[in-house]
Structures are given as C-alpha cells and as structure tokens.
Design a protein with these regions (language model features):
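Acetyl-CoA-dependent GNAT
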Residues: 4-79, 84-86, 94-99, 103, ...
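Conserved GNAT acetyl-CoA-binding A-motif
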Residues: 104-117
Length: 157
C-alpha cells in the first residue's frame, strides 16, 4: 500500500530505513528527517518536498522524497529513495519509483533527475536506476571527494 502524506512518526521511521541500508552517513540521514519536518511544517507545495511511502502489514518499509526543481518549467528531483534492508530486492523500490513517477507526471512534471555517488557501494543503486528506465546524463568526477563522482540520471516521463 502506498501513501503520500507523512506523519510525525515517519521521521524516525525513515531514519531507521536509511540506517538499515548501510549506505548513508549519519549527517545524510539527519537531512532526510529535516525534510519531513519541512513538509509537516509548511506542506508539500511550500516546502518543495513530497513523499511517497510503501507500507507493508502496517509498517513503513520504504519511501521516496521528491520535488520540483526551482526555476525549471517541469523538472523534478528525486532526493531520496530507500527500502528497509529486510525488504530490499522484493520489487518495493521499483513500485515506489513508479508511484512517484505517476505523481510527478500528474503534477505536470516531464523529467526526473536523480543524483547518486559513484562509489562501488552504490553500484547496485546505479543498476537499479538503469533498470527502471533512467539514463546516465552526467558524471562529475571527484565531486564528493577523491574517487567519488556525482552520477546524474534522468528519465523523461
């Protein structure tokens, strides 16, 4: 089941999901929590942060955070997509990204951009983006640090 309205309890849930993955630094997971706070305080439209949650048997097991890119006509960023490690590789991520794409399209969005790390740890993530129809648009070498490129993917809706 999917829902797009965050609750106050979702902040700790998404931090738990991110921590379970082993992909993110603590300062990164805190940012995700702050985006929920922004959404709850200002609303999705004013904050620019929309959410999609995947719930399974009453438990949130994955989420996306996305929003329009300022000063563009119809481009959106996918800021976050994560699935709890116990539910990875079960198709939940694919369903989450498809539901997110539907919402972006319904809002008039025509492109979604995703940024991720070029580190080896993220190889499966980059493969996931390719499998779900995203194209590698650019690589910014050593962006995050030596040997850690920023990989930018795009999908036309």
């Amino acid at each position: 089941m999917f829902r797009n309205t965050p609750t106050h309890s979702d902040k700790s849930t998404i931090i738990d999901i991110l921590n379970s993955s082993g992909y993110f630094y603590d300062h990164e997971t805190m940012v995700a929590g702050e985006l929920i706070d922004e959404n709850l305080e200002k609303g999705a439209e004013r904050s620019g942060y929309n959410f999609m949650f995947a719930d399974y048997e009453g438990k949130t097991v994955g989420f996306t955070c996305y929003g329009p890119i300022a000063c563009t006509e119809s481009s959106h960023d996918l800021f976050w997509i994560a699935v709890h490690k116990d539910f990875m590789f079960k198709g939940i991520g694919k369903q989450l990204i498809q539901e997110t794409e539907k919402c972006v399209k319904k809002a008039g969005g025509t492109r979604i951009y995703i940024e991720t790390s070029g580190r080896e740890l993220y190889k499966s993530t980059r493969g996931f983006y390719l499998k779900t129809g995203y194209i590698l648009e650019a690589e910014l070498e050593d962006f995050y640090g030596p040997g850690d490129s920023k990989m930018i993917y795009v999908k036309k809706l």
